[in-house]
């Protein structure tokens, strides 16, 4: 990976930040798309001797994405989409802006950004999308989040078929110990419930870097959760009826 150039979203917080730091450790040149340039400057001011470029872009603003411009001779060996959000509340409790924001950031913005970046991607570029185990299950009080991630997962699989020259890797994760939960559930009740099984962002970032190097198609963490959800998909209504608490743990 040394000397390659990756463009990353969501790189100033949580898992995205851990991924960026692992990329820099591997001598990768990084371009960050961020909404808050000052925040990025503060976070990475100590990264002396490492190549990192920051470009302002609001992923909730389609015009901001479409207006992105790069030098003609620039190319990207990898594109990591780590931006995302969710609100852990019932369908009826979501307001219009929360619904639109969820699908826009988790799904639509990736499509628009990929279209903008496509001319700058190398012929065998790595496309890494951070999805969720929520894509594989029905969850009360996380319907829009789960639906957006299910759509994203389907999209990544289709992209793999349509562009076999690209390395498409989807990362499906359970709860991670990151600031994501502060916005998803300000009460932090869900985070406290899941405290013992929270994934470590730094270890997950290590796994993602290894997955890029070895061209894995999927990373599923924690593995036990993914295996359990595979069983759930065989008879989903049966599991929902017999184990209702498992599907209402965000309430």
Language-model regions, residue ranges each:
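Active-site helix of classical SDR
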Residues: 114, 148
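Substrate-binding pocket helix/loop in short-chain dehydrogenase/reductase
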Residues: 90-91, 95-101
């Amino acid at each position: 990976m040394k000397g390659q150039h990756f463009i990353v979203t969501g790189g100033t917080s949580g898992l995205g930040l851990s991924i960026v730091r692992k990329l820099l450790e591997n001598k990768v040149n990084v371009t960050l798309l961020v909404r808050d340039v000052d925040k990025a400057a503060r976070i990475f001011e100590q990264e002396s001797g490492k190549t990192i470029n920051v470009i302002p872009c609001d992923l909730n603003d389609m015009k901001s994405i479409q207006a992105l411009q790069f030098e003609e001779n620039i190319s990207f060996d990898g594109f990591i989409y780590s931006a995302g959000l969710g609100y852990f509340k019932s369908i009826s409790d979501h307001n219009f802006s929360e619904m639109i924001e969820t699908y826009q950031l988790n799904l639509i913005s990736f499509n628009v950004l990929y279209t903008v970046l496509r001319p700058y991607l190398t012929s065998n570029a790595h496309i890494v999308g951070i999805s969720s185990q929520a894509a594989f299950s029905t969850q009360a009080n996380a319907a829009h989040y789960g639906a957006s991630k299910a759509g994203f997962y389907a999209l990544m699989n289709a992209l793999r078929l349509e562009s076999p020259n690209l390395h498409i890797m989807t990362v499906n994760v359970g709860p991670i110990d990151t600031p994501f939960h502060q916005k998803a559930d300000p009460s932090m009740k869900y985070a406290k419930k899941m405290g013992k099984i929270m994934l470590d962002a730094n270890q997950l970032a290590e796994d993602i870097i290894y997955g890029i190097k070895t061209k894995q198609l999927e990373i599923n963490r924690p593995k036990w959760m993914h295996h359990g959800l595979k069983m759930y998909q065989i008879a989903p209504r049966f599991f929902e009826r017999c184990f209702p608490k498992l599907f209402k743990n965000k309430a």
